[in-house]
Amino acid sequence: MRKLLSALILSFSIWSVFSCRQENNVTVKQYPMFWTWLDYRPGMNFDSVCQVMNDIGMDGIMLNAPTPDDYRIAIPIARKHGIEVYAWLWTMNLEHDRDKILAEHPDWFSVNRNGKSLADTTAYVDYYKFLCPALPEVREFIREKIKSYCEVEGLSGIAIDYNRLVDVVLPTTLWPHYGIVQDREYAAWDYGYHPAMLEKFKSRYGYDPREQQDPSADIKWRQFRCDQITEVANMIAGVVHSYGKTMAASPFPTPKMASRMVRQDWGKWNLDIVFPMVYHTFYTEDVSFISDCTVENVRDKNDKTVLYCGMTATDGPEMFECMDAALNSGAQGIAVFTVAGLRSFEVKKRFKAYTDSVRAVRAANGGIIEAVHPHVADTNPFTHKGIMALVEKRMRRIVAEASGKEELPPLALGEYKQTESYDATRCYRVADENSRTVFKVTFYFYGDVLSGWDVVAE
């Protein structure tokens, strides 16, 4: 009885949160509402994965498979379970054909501001082998690859990924893993300096961006590289649409963040549907990041693009907080990375109840879920209660470690005073009267949202 009551309360709360009105005579194309990304490999038990998806209410899958023929095997299995399949394809970063292209076309690879090519150097990880989008032969290679997948019968769409440059700035929670701080753009990670890219820019604007004192501050140069990626995306869209299929993408969290971090101005892409990867655990670690990004995406996406929200799987209550944050802020559906992360019976059961309820709301409102959150993201870090709680927890841990104690002590914080502001970075200083510790607290704003933070003791 208690489980049934919980399901009824969940259904009622969603109806209340999403109650809205739909204008008459508005026709909205219906896409699958709940998705996952998944790697497909020959020999895997794909039927059992599809059964789990069907059981919990997922009806769309972005599938990454090595060859077009693998999709010809997988699609009938997915369809048996009522699941629509998009090919999840890497574009500017090579995947299944990486070694072949490295051997045959080392001149195709992206170059950083220091003149180092990915053909013979590494950026973060070995599999980062990005191509130069300015090269006609690279575009033709991508075009032919996309065509080969579009020819697969029963494939509903193409969802592109890695259609960008190398991360000039990583999400903040990944910095410790690489032993770096990216409070501004640094040359080693600033890619897009292939000779063909530089020549193309110079022929248009009359100068070499490397001549600038700080090339990262050159807005024309930044936007030019974004536009090269946009041209590739829209070339792909033209191919996909010529086959009558849906064009989708999985870009970074918002167009403004993506433009700064990976030169991916995806609000200008000709997408039918977009699944921005709003992975809050990589950024602020607070669910408010999902709300802020989704609000920005409603504003900055292509008007013809249907907005979804991609998020990491959480095998607990936070999964539903994340989906609420996205749907309340204007997303029309959810993509989870990945379904395998939803493991417990209780979470799967609740996920099914959630998907059923949200679909009912969408159907009752003419195919649309309207936003109920404010239309402007909150850029004041001190009003983000969840983020500030995490900041203070980090402070308490620092004090405890310094004193050799396991118990986290209480804080008596004074006033936060801003000490510095540059590029996307704001620095503050605050003292704890109890421990006599002074903390440096830094917030990062890549795009128009609070995208990361850090705390250290001075």
Model-derived features: positions:
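Substrate-binding cleft/loops of secretory-pathway carbohydrate-active enzymes
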Residues: 168, 246-286
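Aromatic-lined carbohydrate-recognition surfaces of secreted/lumenal glycan-active proteins
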Residues: 159, 205, 220-260, 305-315
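The substrate-binding groove and active-site-proximal loops of carbohydrate-active enzymes
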Residues: 37, 58-65, 124-140, 218-228, ...
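Active-site-adjacent "subsite" loops/lids of carbohydrate-active enzymes
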Residues: 87-150
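Substrate-binding cleft of secreted/luminal carbohydrate-active enzymes
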Residues: 276-287, 303-370
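Aromatic- and acidic-residue-enriched segments that line the glycan-binding/catalytic groove
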Residues: 94-122, 163-210
